[in-house]
Amino acid sequence: MEAEETMECLQEFPEHHKMILDRLNEQREQDRFTDITLIVDGHHFKAHKAVLAACSKFFYKFFQEFTQEPLVEIEGVSKMAFRHLIEFTYTAKLMIQGEEEANDVWKAAEFLQMLEAIKALEVRNKENSAPLEENTTGKNEAKKRKIAETSNVITESLPSAESEPVEIEVEIAEGTIEVEDEGVETLEEVASAKQSVKYIQSTGSSDDSALALLADITSKYRQGDRKGQIKEDGCPSDPTSKQEHMKSHSTESFKCEICNKRYLRESAWKQHLNCYHLEEGGVSKKQRTGKKIHVCQYCEKQFDHFGHFKEHLRKHTGEKPFECPNCHERFARNSTLKCHLTACQTGVGAKKGRKKLYECQVCNSVFNSWDQFKDHLVIHTGDKPNHCTLCDLWFMQGNELRRHLSDAHNISERLVTEEVLSVETRVQTEPVTSMTIIEQVGKVHVLPLLQVQVDSAQVTVEQVHPDLLQGSQVHDSHMSELPEQVQVSYLEVGRIQTEEGTEVHVEELHVERVNQMPVEVQTELLEADLDHATPEIMNQEERESSQADAAEAAREDHEDAEDLETKPTVDSEAEKAENEDRTAMPVLE
């Protein structure tokens, strides 16, 4: 029986992870195998989802919920700060200059919950502060070193991961500290190690940094897994009286009235106030740079960047200042417009009569209808173009708006499939420049505008191109493109009064194009049952025959009127002649 082979561990290669990270960074710079595009202030950043999820709790939670999103727009983060964090994610190096730039990167790291970047910024802040004074005799003044604070995470537009605040502090209280384990590093060694750091660099292991080592020492003391014991003056060491002693400590939490964050210790609460909200001059560290704070008048949210403040206001006002030059769609952000322009196709130069196909440049989906393509784009842009004017709500899809109107306001939209509709003209003083055409309508009865008063008229819409029908509305920009495909014919019926007071029935057929006759009509659906209505389709022969019949009827009416006029004259002359004959005859007695 052969002896069992034992698994032996070969030599470790600590540089392997660095080589992998360098290769991933090269692929990112060359845009190879990237599966996510991040839009920050209109700038596109290519990256890998797996790398982002490994370095950020924010992206880890987001990619779990939205797995198929190839394009994500992030608000509340500046382009400069996000570029630094992307470089740190792929190179483990963080190069920043100035306090203002450091504050922006800090805010972005808190937003994205990148703990390693926050630790690196803490190291930088400690290096810029005054060096620690080495004193072997010790001091009575308490010293605190804060590692990281990640609870102040802003989640404005995207959901963030739910995590407990991470805060590690070391307090050297008044009195003496006795350590019985010789293998534990002292605070002086940690301080000297921290002063030797000259370049902010993370190698992927938290134990390599001095602050992480300090946190490790502190956690070992608190957990009691070492032989080291910390004795506090005034606290009993007897286990029996320890429970009674712990009752003397207050269990009340300290709450920040500004950001509603809670702390178990008063010292941590005061340090939070000094770092983020209050200072001797009433100005926090984040407000030292002299930036103006912009406050939203609707929701009282604060912004230190005016550009972010303006974009936020458009959510309340509904303003959309950026317009697409091709399809005239409007957007609230310029970055959303740029994303729309990459996929917008107007069909200019295409042959008439050929169906235009619209391809999405993000996911390569193809649509044969502009309405379907436009509804698909909002999935990538996140825009909500459908607006309810009754309750000021916005919806992403048109069917969501229709469902809302039906459920909330009891307004149901009837789909027009009949071919005969009854409409009335709207008398206005200003010139009319548009006409409503409803899909699948063969004939519409209207009263003509700018004509003599008549009884009725008939308007026929023929050869309506499908691209002209967008939500039952024809746009003027498309009218000029297809002048030969839409024409309107209407039959004018009138009565002409002759000099003798007789009314003559006259009919006249008119054929004009839509773009040459501006008409505006207000459609009203028939209340009767239109299912049994038979559509009337007028072809060219029927028009000619109706025109000939109208002319013939007018001629006959005119002849009848002349006959009625000449007949009384003949009768009167005959009676006169008869009377004269009677007077000329002799009277016989």
Swiss-Prot record:
**Cross-link Glycyl lysine isopeptide (Lys-Gly) (interchain with G-Cter in SUMO): residue positions:** 567
Any single Pfam family the record assigns to this protein: BTB
Every BTB domain range: 34-98
Provide this UniProt record's keywords sorted from A to Z: DNA-binding, Isopeptide bond, Metal-binding, Nucleus, Repeat, Repressor, Transcription, Transcription regulation, Ubl conjugation, Zinc, Zinc-finger
The places in or outside the cell where this protein is found are:
Nucleus
| Location in chain, cross-link Glycyl lysine isopeptide (Lys-Gly) (interchain with G-Cter in SUMO2) | 255, 261
The residue numbers the entry assigns to motif Nuclear localization signal 2 are 283-294
Mark the C2H2-type zinc finger spans by residue number: 254-277, 294-316, 322-347, 358-380, 386-409
Q: Where is the composition biased (Basic and acidic residues)?
A: 224-234, 539-583
Please provide, alphabetically and separated by semicolons, the GO molecular function terms listed in this UniProt record: DNA binding; DNA-binding transcription factor activity, RNA polymerase II-specific; zinc ion binding
Stretches for region Disordered: 224-247, 539-589
**Matching CDD domains:** BTB_POZ_ZBTB35_ZNF131
Kindly provide the PTM information from the record: Monosumoylated at Lys-567 by CBX4 and UHRF2. Sumoylation may potentiate ZNF131 inhibition of estrogen signaling. Sumoylation does not interfere with ubiquitination.
Tell me where the sequence motif Nuclear localization signal 1 sits in this chain.
137-148
Source domain of life is Eukaryota
One GO cellular component term, please give it.
nucleus
Q: Does the keyword Transcription apply?
A: yes
| Family according to the record | Belongs to the krueppel C2H2-type zinc-finger protein family.
UniProt xrefs under PANTHER family: ZINC FINGER PROTEIN, ZINC FINGER PROTEIN 131
Q: What does this protein do?
A: May be involved in transcriptional regulation as a repressor of ESR1/ER-alpha signaling. Plays a role during development and organogenesis as well as in the function of the adult central nervous system.
The protein's name: Zinc finger protein 131
Q: What is the lineage of its organism?
A: Eukaryota, Metazoa, Chordata, Craniata, Vertebrata
Q: Which gene encodes it?
A: ZNF131
